[in-house]
Amino acid sequence: VVEAGAGRGTLARAVVAAGPRCLEAGTYLMVERSAVLRADQPSGIGFASSAHIPDGGITGVVVANELLDNLPFGLLAADGDRWRSVRVGLEADQLVEVLAEERLPPVDIAPVPGARIPDQGSAAAWTTGALESLDLGALLVVDYTSTTTEMATRPVDQWLRTYRDHQQGGRPVDDPGSQDITVEVAVDQLPEPTSTTDQSTFLVVHGIDDLVAEGRQTWTEQATIGDLAAVRGRSRIVEAG
């Protein structure tokens, strides 16, 4: 398993602790650019860490869990019969949005007055590179998704969002560096996937109901003890919603 954007290895710890058969003779490679975050990742048998995804030769699965929505993207605005790039300018010591050069949209979509769309070339390039790194296996992407056409019909602040201290922030140009900027992923701008599904269906197909039932039984039997197994059982129930 190769996890891109693994951070401190929270997901890696959970996956390895579950003891999946696919890792009995394999390794969980945590890919994280930040040296600070890599320093907090788990180590030992079953774990490996790197700043980069291997160029090729991977047999297994590459996982991107809420990675693509954080990659750099462009923003296009409809202006008459064309699309134009949205840039950032300075006006009276304030950062403002400025319509700049004409741009071709990433997919074939007509400009409609007031419409805006993302240009997610970085996400498309990352996905292509991840697929090319696989000799045998699959790429699993988990993210908030939409389509370019669908986003063009919605207010931009519904799919281009900012967060500060785990709460929704202000405009993307407000207080640079103080808030995270995230965007829904337009799946029609990525290489065509083999299949897509929503998170609920994916979890049910892969046995979430059985795992929750097992956790509920563990919690019922060991709640009075309050040991780690009991806490894990309760966590399954709570996190499954």
Regions inferred by a protein language model and the residue ranges of each:
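Short, well-ordered beta-to-alpha junction loops that form the rim of enzyme active sites
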Residues: 6, 67, 142-146
